[in-house]
């Protein structure tokens, strides 16, 4: 956390991915040329470790689709998750030889890739009304504000130039 200039407040809890740097070193070593995309929900370190907003960290658990706050109960029967620190992911990637090319929302990422054109192309396909509706609903869900559209996409590259 010192590398990022982050100092936790007294009593503040934070989640740290100890396997992040070794994993990104492995990924970068396996990649001669190309992109690494990290897609998940999370924040930059400055936002993530803001004690005013998250004194208790971001760790949450879900049991049968209901959020709980007891990670050491129902072991093996509930999901445990935490938000991604995208500043740490970018920093670890850079140390491993990747260039950080951008961090955007999934909504913007898919839009920039031409999601609207895909939507138009699907409209020209010979699909049933039910299939068309399912495709429309799926596309909307991927970019929905406040939902999956808020996922972050970190784009890192190796030997690809700049955007």
Model-derived regions, located:
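Long, Lys/Arg- and hydrophobic-enriched amphipathic alpha-helices
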Residues: 1-163
């Amino acid at each position: 956390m010192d590398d990022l200039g982050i100092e936790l407040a007294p009593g503040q809890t934070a989640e740290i991915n100890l396997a992040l740097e070794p994993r990104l070193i492995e990924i970068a070593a396996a990649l001669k040329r190309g992109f690494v995309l990290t897609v998940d929900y999370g924040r930059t370190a400055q936002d993530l470790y803001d004690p005013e907003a998250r004194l208790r960290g971001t760790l949450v658990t879900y049991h049968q689709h209901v959020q709980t706050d007891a990670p050491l109960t129902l072991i093996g029967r509930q999901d445990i998750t935490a938000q991604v620190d995208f500043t740490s992911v970018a920093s670890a990637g850079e140390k491993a030889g990747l260039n950080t090319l951008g961090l955007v929302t999934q909504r913007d990422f898919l839009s920039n890739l031409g999601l609207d054109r895909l939507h138009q192309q699907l409209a020209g396909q010979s699909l049933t009304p039910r299939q068309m509706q399912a495709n429309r609903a799926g596309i909307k869900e991927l970019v929905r504000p406040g939902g999956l559209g808020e996922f972050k996409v970190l784009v890192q590259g190796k030997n690809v130039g700049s955007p």
